[in-house]
Amino acid sequence: MSSRIDRDVINALIAGHFADPFSVLGMHQTQAGLEVRALLPDATDVWVIEPKTGRKVGKLECLDARGFFCGVLPRRKNFFRYQLAVTWHGQQNLIDDPYRFGPLIQEMDAWLLSEGTHLRPYETLGAHADTMDGVTGTRFSVWAPNARRVSVVGQFNYWDGRRHPMRLRKESGIWELFIPGAHNGQLYKFELLDANGNLRIKADPYAFEAQMRPETASMICGLPEKVTPSEERQKANQFDAPISIYEVHLGSWRRHTDNNFWLSYRELADQLVPYAKWMGFTHLELLPVNEHPFDGSWGYQPTGLYAPTRRFGTRDDFRYFINAAHAAGLNVILDWVPGHFPSDEFSLAEFDGTHLYEHSDPREGYHQDWNTLIYNYGRREVSNYLVGNALYWMERFGIDALRVDAVASMIYRDYSRKEGEWIPNEFGGRENLEAIEFLRNTNRIIGEQVPGAVSMAEESTDFAGVTRPPETGGLGFWFKWNLGWMHDTLDYMKLDPVYRQYHHDKLTFGMLYNHTENFVLPLSHDEVVHGKKSILDRMPGDAWQKFANLRAYYGWMWAFPGKKLLFMGNEFAQGREWNHDASLDWHLLEGGDNWHHGVQRLVRDLNHTYRHHKALHELDFDAYGFEWLVVDDNERSVLIFVRRDKAGNEIIVASNFTPVPRHDYRFGINQPGRWREILNTDSMHYHGSNTGNGGVVHSDEIESHGRQHSLNLTLPPLATIWLMREGE
């Protein structure tokens, strides 16, 4: 005889409106004795089984035809391990009862999660294969403090929200449940009765794998093993290291020619990685690989921050790709988007019926430029979710650096907003103080937890101290994209050479602020889309002049202080804009040797020469590493400077940005002796006119530009040359 269960409780449980299933289901000590209760829709017969002997201990009575069973076990007083023999559609199945297991999340973890100080929340939240009390299965947990009820639905329960309602840990707002038999590879979601009584089906914010779009389910997947960064990888990120970044969109670098389908992670490991190594790049930067529903977002509107996109393969395939890059001596940078997320119903938006991850006021929580939602960084659990994600990619995949997207949109409340469309901070200012603190905290934790890992900021304003320590008012990034340099130099290069003399300062201005931050010089994906034209097509003149201008510009860029970044396709001067739905124009490199081969060879030589000579990279962020030799010859559009290493070795860089060769061009130098031309962008090897200095030039004891010794050079048309001192 079972104890009396309130009919309203049974109805609420079956209807999915009951918040505390563990208070009813499972094994309970009652006045009637030891009682077992189970909600098993469509079952016709249920027995309690003792696992050791397989003996039937007692039969459960069907109290409701919709699947509620209950029974008192005779001669049993103490709790024990049990299983249920359940008959469905005439077939008996032996199952473990999810409601016989105790709380899953340890009190310390729950406290840290609530405080927002759990360094690795992904180790607790989400779906994790586990063995409990000798039973294999998966433990699920999700943060949804305002939901009235949360269930796990998936392939293991016919996507039926009645079958696996979860336990609420009220102190943290986390719902949890261990489901015996649920295993890796199975799909799942969370079904929530939200704060307003509406039903929502949500993907797991902490899912390690997800379905291929347009499907949106999460996939049970084990946590990857930790990756220990090698000493070589750590050194490759240092300020004095040569850093030349090849920025890549994995879906359009190259495609299968027969069906225009993407290459897989493993195919990219076999093709992209050796190509980048051959080209001499030191780093691969990947446009976001987090799962995202819309191809046209390029990954910048992610819905699965913890899941590599299935477009190119599995999570393990992605790890294979990263391992291949590391084996080839390439560090991997991941574009990371902690600034906003899309409003898709299956994702984070109004997760539990409230504005849980985003701000409730659209003046704070809605990004009108991208039709996305903005994270509420002031909510500890939200910041914890994001900080944990940064560590996840670095520790579990071996990502060497994160490039943080759209930092300006995060740190300014009035970003892209008119007056009246934004809310000031507590001091009446425009800064988003919570976002600033989040970025500082993220960078601090990266520095403490992942030796050698770094972060880079795409920050488009003049916010002071992006790469300075937080204790001095900075954001704590290691590097910042120099978007000002990029805009100024491209504006200069697109001018007809006749008019460049009037805009000389666009090339010199960058040095006035160059040492305020640790800069990366970016020619990124943003510069070859939306009608901006390709980098090649921005160059003025006929075809010969376009290619000559581009080569001269690359020679200038690779010698200028700052780390280098080049988006794919620019290394061989693709003529059209980037199209994310198609392969790069590799056909331009087919057939006989041409101008595109010339640019490709130049970029390869730039990379290898840049890496070989410390003067070109060792003191990028030290004033001693750079000195103007000729800065004011605007009439002839000539600029000459010195790069210097710690030992004082110099490389001279001279650029002529007109199509007129400058013969007998004399300028003063610091170190007399024999100088060799080690790179000339006008060389015949790059399909230039082959004007130059015949290899070696000797200095003269003739005063020039305030220096006792000087060189007399021929400066090729629309070209940059590099010279290295060989001796006295």
From Swiss-Prot:
<keyword id="KW-0320">Glycogen biosynthesis</keyword>
<feature type="active site" description="Proton donor">
    <location>
        <position position="458"/>
    </location>
</feature>
<dbReference type="GO" id="GO:0005978">
    <property type="term" value="P:glycogen biosynthetic process"/>
</dbReference>
<dbReference type="GO" id="GO:0003844">
    <property type="term" value="F:1,4-alpha-glucan branching enzyme activity"/>
</dbReference>
<dbReference type="InterPro" id="IPR014756">
    <property type="entry name" value="Ig_E-set"/>
</dbReference>
<dbReference type="GO" id="GO:0004553">
    <property type="term" value="F:hydrolase activity, hydrolyzing O-glycosyl compounds"/>
</dbReference>
<dbReference type="InterPro" id="IPR037439">
    <property type="entry name" value="Branching_enzy"/>
</dbReference>
<dbReference type="Pfam" id="PF22019">
    <property type="entry name" value="GlgB_N"/>
</dbReference>
<dbReference type="InterPro" id="IPR006047">
    <property type="entry name" value="Glyco_hydro_13_cat_dom"/>
</dbReference>
<dbReference type="InterPro" id="IPR017853">
    <property type="entry name" value="Glycoside_hydrolase_SF"/>
</dbReference>
<dbReference type="GO" id="GO:0043169">
    <property type="term" value="F:cation binding"/>
</dbReference>
<dbReference type="Pfam" id="PF00128">
    <property type="entry name" value="Alpha-amylase"/>
</dbReference>
<comment type="similarity">
    <text>Belongs to the glycosyl hydrolase 13 family. GlgB subfamily.</text>
</comment>
<dbReference type="InterPro" id="IPR006407">
    <property type="entry name" value="GlgB"/>
</dbReference>
<dbReference type="GO" id="GO:0005829">
    <property type="term" value="C:cytosol"/>
</dbReference>
<comment type="function">
    <text>Catalyzes the formation of the alpha-1,6-glucosidic linkages in glycogen by scission of a 1,4-alpha-linked oligosaccharide from growing alpha-1,4-glucan chains and the subsequent attachment of the oligosaccharide to the alpha-1,6 position.</text>
</comment>
<dbReference type="Pfam" id="PF02806">
    <property type="entry name" value="Alpha-amylase_C"/>
</dbReference>
<keyword id="KW-0328">Glycosyltransferase</keyword>
<dbReference type="Pfam" id="PF02922">
    <property type="entry name" value="CBM_48"/>
</dbReference>
<dbReference type="InterPro" id="IPR004193">
    <property type="entry name" value="Glyco_hydro_13_N"/>
</dbReference>
<protein>
    <recommendedName>
        <fullName>1,4-alpha-glucan branching enzyme GlgB</fullName>
        <ecNumber>2.4.1.18</ecNumber>
    </recommendedName>
</protein>
<keyword id="KW-0321">Glycogen metabolism</keyword>
<dbReference type="InterPro" id="IPR013780">
    <property type="entry name" value="Glyco_hydro_b"/>
</dbReference>
<dbReference type="InterPro" id="IPR044143">
    <property type="entry name" value="GlgB_N_E_set_prok"/>
</dbReference>
<feature type="active site" description="Nucleophile">
    <location>
        <position position="405"/>
    </location>
</feature>
<comment type="subunit">
    <text>Monomer.</text>
</comment>
<comment type="pathway">
    <text>Glycan biosynthesis; glycogen biosynthesis.</text>
</comment>
<dbReference type="InterPro" id="IPR054169">
    <property type="entry name" value="GlgB_N"/>
</dbReference>
<dbReference type="InterPro" id="IPR006048">
    <property type="entry name" value="A-amylase/branching_C"/>
</dbReference>
<dbReference type="InterPro" id="IPR013783">
    <property type="entry name" value="Ig-like_fold"/>
</dbReference>
<keyword id="KW-0119">Carbohydrate metabolism</keyword>
<keyword id="KW-0808">Transferase</keyword>
